[in-house]
Amino acid sequence: FLEGIVEKKTGKLRLSLSLSKKGKTARVNSLETPRLSQYIGKLNVILFSPEDLSLVKGSPAVRRRFIDMEFGQIDAVYLYELTRYRTILRDRNVYLKQLQTKQSTDRVYLEVLTEQLAKSGAKIILKRLEFLKELENYAKILHADITQQKENLTFKYKCTASIDDLEMNQGAIEIRLKETFETIVDKEIFQGTTLIGPHRDDVSFKVNGRNVQTYGSQGQQRTTALAVKLAEIDLMRAKTGEYPVLLLDDVLSELDGERQTHLLKAIQDKVQTFLTTPGLNDIARQLIKQPRLFRINAGKIEVRPETIDRKSTRL
């Protein structure tokens, strides 16, 4: 069980989340929310952990999850459409399996599901393109600052249905999705699964025109990941009018001194930050000028003095 009070411009909110064998229960001001999707966005949070450094070199699923998690916090329409898309996708995959195993031979229902999926998918793709363009604008500035103006960062949305030649509007994307589904329907029935759509799309990051995932050094990959994560902070503030809460989960030990400095510069005196670390060696002095220290020992949380013994590396 976790509970806290969030102070926003619109007032205070008491948020709680409990986990039991029956599932998760979320409450806002002691009132249970019927769906967890209605809870998301009440407190905007950005998590930065060592795993996020694999945002660039990880699998497409990692980058899709990043988009859905971060964008879903600030756009309720996107979150709703994403939930709807997943429901239709699940139904379509079930029916494709039935066609594959000859449990059904009627393709009319498949056409209905395909039309619904294309319409919902087009909305998601358009929203993602808009989100990534805004995020790119912030990330470019941060990335150029970190690299001392030597490198230029750009994003590229990689759609499984080619849309590069289209005008970016929902209708055009929807038509292209339908056309692509028509050309691969037999292959989808043979494999028993949906082969194209937002659930299979990807994002690539390019530095000076070269794919940093394929051709970038480890330093370039980490700089790109850092710029993208820091850009989230500015984008969330622009969209919501408030800074998010930042969670740094043992990530500073993974960054060199220069990247730590840029991280601190981006959050100093602006963002409420919770940082976890096994010791203090990897934390820059300027980050902990006025800290509140907590030590977790055997599952218990102890409040520590707000002064740090620099001779010791232990909390």
Feature map (PLM): residue ranges:
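Walker B catalytic acidic pair
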Residues: 249-251
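A short, compositionally biased
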Residues: 1-2, 18-23, 198-203, 288-290
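Nucleotide-state sensing region of NTPase/ATPase domains
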Residues: 1-62, 67-78, 138-141, 173, ...
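A conserved P-loop NTPase coupling/switch region
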Residues: 38-42, 50-115, 119, 290, ...
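Structural recognition of the conserved hydrophobic beta-strand(s) that form the central parallel beta-sheet
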Residues: 272-278
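Hydrophobic positions in the central parallel beta-sheet of the AAA+
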Residues: 48, 244-247, 275
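Conserved beta-strand scaffold positions in the cores of enzyme catalytic domains, especially
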Residues: 45-47, 273, 293-295
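Conserved NTPase motor "head" modules and their coupling/switch loops across ABC/AAA+ ATPases, GTPases
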Residues: 104-245, 254-258, 262-270, 281-288, ...
